[in-house]
């Protein structure tokens, strides 16, 4: 029984130190800015300039559903989490499932980024927006 514990413990430590499976890793903000062009139909990178969706300036580290001046939140209104790499990665993978999993009403965002590298790059870019 003890022999089986050490490999499992080693695997758990390795996954933890590697950042876990939830986030693909460090992205390239320059590439992310290019991928973000797909997002610009609905989102702005300028503070306070909202479109169909909220401005994404300052989104990293901000409590979800709280972009100042944006009033159209559905699924993220009243959220109790703050955007970090893992949550942004999960959200961008499938926004509708993300909000449903958290018991929210839904989201009008149907766009998703299917490629891990693109999500990592966009997240790296979002981190540069203040």
Labelled PLM ranges:
Residues 1-10:
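Bacterial N-terminal signal peptides that target proteins for export
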Residues 19-36:
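Electrostatic cytochrome c docking/interface patches
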Residues 7-8, 15-23:
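C-terminal segment of classical bacterial N-terminal signal peptides
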Residues 54, 68-118:
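Axial heme c-ligation environment in periplasmic c-type cytochrome domains
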Residues 32, 36-45, 122:
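The canonical Cys-X-X-Cys-His
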Residues 43-49, 61-62:
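Detector for the c-type heme attachment site
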């Amino acid at each position: 029984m003890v022999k089986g514990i050490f490999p499992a413990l080693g695997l758990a430590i390795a996954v933890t130190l590697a950042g876990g499976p939830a986030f693909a890793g460090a992205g390239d903000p320059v590439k992310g800015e290019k991928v973000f062009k797909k997002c610009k139909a609905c989102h702005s990178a300028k503070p306070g300039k909202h479109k169909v969706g909220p401005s994404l300036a300052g989104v990293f580290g901000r409590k979800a559903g709280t972009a100042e001046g944006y009033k159209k939140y559905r699924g993220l209104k009243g959220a109790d989490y703050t955007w970090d790499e893992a949550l942004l990665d999960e959200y961008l993978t499938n926004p509708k499932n993300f909000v449903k999993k958290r018991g929210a009403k839904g989201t009008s965002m149907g766009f998703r980024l299917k490629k891990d590298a693109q999500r990592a790059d966009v997240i790296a870019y979002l981190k540069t927006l203040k």
